[in-house]
C-alpha cells in the first residue's frame, strides 16, 4: 500500500519570501512603507525588516498578526466585486 499523502516541506525561507512579496505588493499599491505597515499591524516598525533579513528571527504569532492585518487591509481596498 502506498502513502497517498504527500507532504510539501515549507521552509523558513518560503514563509519569509511569501510575506515579504505580499508586503511589497501592498506597500507599492498603497504608497506606504514597511515601517508604517509594521506599526499599524503589530506595533513594531522593524518587524518586516526582521522578516526580510534571514539572519534575524521573528515570532510566528506576530507573523500571523501581520498576515491577518494584510488580509483585512486588502479586503478594504478591493473594488466591489460582490453582487
Predicted regions and their residues:
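Amphipathic alpha-helical interface segments used for dimerization/assembly
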Residues: 23, 27, 41, 66-70
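Histidine kinase transmitter module recognition
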Residues: 26-29, 54
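Short, charged recognition helix plus adjacent turn
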Residues: 6, 12, 74-83
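Short alpha-helical DNA-recognition segment
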Residues: 31-47
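Catalytic phosphate/metal-binding cores of nucleic-acid and nucleotide-processing enzymes, i.e., regions
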Residues: 35-36, 48-49, 61, 73-77
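Short, basic-rich loop-to-helix N-cap that marks the start of a DNA-contacting helix
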Residues: 47-67
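A short, Lys/Arg-rich alpha-helix, primarily the initiator
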Residues: 2-27
Amino acid at each position: 500500500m502506498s502513502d497517498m499523502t504527500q507532504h510539501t516541506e515549507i521552509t523558513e525561507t518560503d514563509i519569509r519570501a511569501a510575506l515579504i512579496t505580499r508586503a511589497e505588493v501592498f506597500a507599492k499599491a498603497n504608497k506606504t512603507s514597511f515601517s508604517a505597515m509594521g506599526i499599524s499591524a503589530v506595533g513594531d516598525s522593524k518587524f518586516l525588516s526582521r522578516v526580510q533579513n534571514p539572519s534575524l528571527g521573528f515570532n510566528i504569532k506576530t507573523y500571523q498578526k501581520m498576515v491577518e492585518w494584510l488580509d483585512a487591509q486588502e479586503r478594504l481596498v478591493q473594488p466591489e466585486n460582490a453582487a
